[in-house]
Design a protein with these regions (language model features):
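Compositionally biased linear targeting/interaction segments
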Residues: 1-303
Length: 303
């Protein structure tokens, strides 16, 4: 009995040691893949390849196999700049930016929630992430959330992930599934410059909201469907030109022809264990210059 216990203990210890070594190895591989992803994006940006990276082409078209000693590893890129930045509705002091909150409501309404529901959720999100305790007309502050069966307080800070919206009053599972593909979490009080070359007609609400609802959704969808195979060129003015601009909407920085954020997804698999890392890489816009940098990373998996 004693020998059996010793054998079991040793076997368990060996397995744990092997698992820990495998986990450490895979985490090192994830770090190496991160450096490789940055290098690939930097080369693509400097070589002009990002101008032709559409939603399904160029850099975003193929999965890249990575060399590893055991198991398998892959890297895939996707545009991450066809989204509304939820954190843009507050400034650096945690105060609500009224114009951006209004645009957020316009977006939600255009996605299909309707004008009233869109405005209500925009109010609720603003109350959840701003620092004060003043309640927006259709919002909710701590006095609401602390009265729930499972009480909690508002974040009072920018969100790190769009998934945090599920905790907010009015954001049901069904509503979240509808709006999440249009949203992202980036820097406070900063709008994401939308990559027009990565848009599909389904994403017309982004342009609609960014331009304060100036042009009908159907016109925007029609223009997106006319995106040339090589993308809009020589610059974004070719995209805006058919609309005209009688209301004098400031179009500067609303959209561009290259991604300003790129998602890089690393998947490592070995001995029925896996590590998945999702990076958001910030790419300096146009002539801004500078190197791509990791804006955020999420590491997960079954190791």
């Amino acid at each position: 009995f004693v020998m059996l216990s010793i054998t079991t203990t040793v076997t368990t210890g060996v397995r744990r040691g092997a698992n820990e070594r495998l986990r450490t190895e895979m985490l090192w591989q994830a770090q190496a893949a991160e450096r490789l992803a940055l290098s690939i994006v930097e080369r693509a940006a400097s070589g002009g390849a990002l101008k032709t990276a559409s939603s399904e082409g160029g850099l975003f078209k193929q999965q890249i196999a990575l060399p590893v000693e055991r198991g398998a590893a892959s890297l895939r890129f996707a545009d991450a700049s066809r989204c509304f930045n939820v954190n843009s509705i507050i400034d650096g002091d945690g105060k609500i930016v009224a114009d951006e909150k209004t645009r957020f409501g316009l977006l939600l309404g255009a996605i299909g929630l309707g004008e009233n529901k869109g405005a209500a959720i925009a109010d609720a999100v603003a109350d959840f992430i701003d620092r004060d305790s003043s309640q927006e007309s259709q919002g909710a502050e701590d006095n609401f959330y602390t009265g729930l069966t499972t009480p909690f307080r508002t974040a009072g800070a920018p969100i790190a992930s769009v998934s945090e919206l599920r905790a907010i009053d009015g954001v049901t599972k069904e509503i979240y599934a509808r709006i999440a593909p249009f949203l992202c979490a980036r820097e406070v009080n900063k709008r994401v410059e939308i990559n027009a070359n990565a848009l599909t007609p389904d994403f017309a609400p982004l342009i609609y909201a960014a331009t304060d609802g100036t042009w009908p959704l159907e016109e925007i969808r029609a223009q997106i469907s006319k995106t040339p195979p090589g993308g809009w060129s020589p610059d974004i003015s070719a995209f805006w030109q058919p609309f005209g601009n009688p209301q004098g909407v400031n179009l500067a920085g609303l959209a561009g022809t290259e991604p300003t954020f790129i998602e890089a997804r690393v998947l490592l698999e070995a001995e029925q264990r896996f590590v998945e890392e999702t990076l958001i890489i910030k790419v300096p816009a146009g002539a801004a210059g500078g190197e791509p940098k990791v804006f955020s990373r999420v590491l997960g998996g079954g190791v």
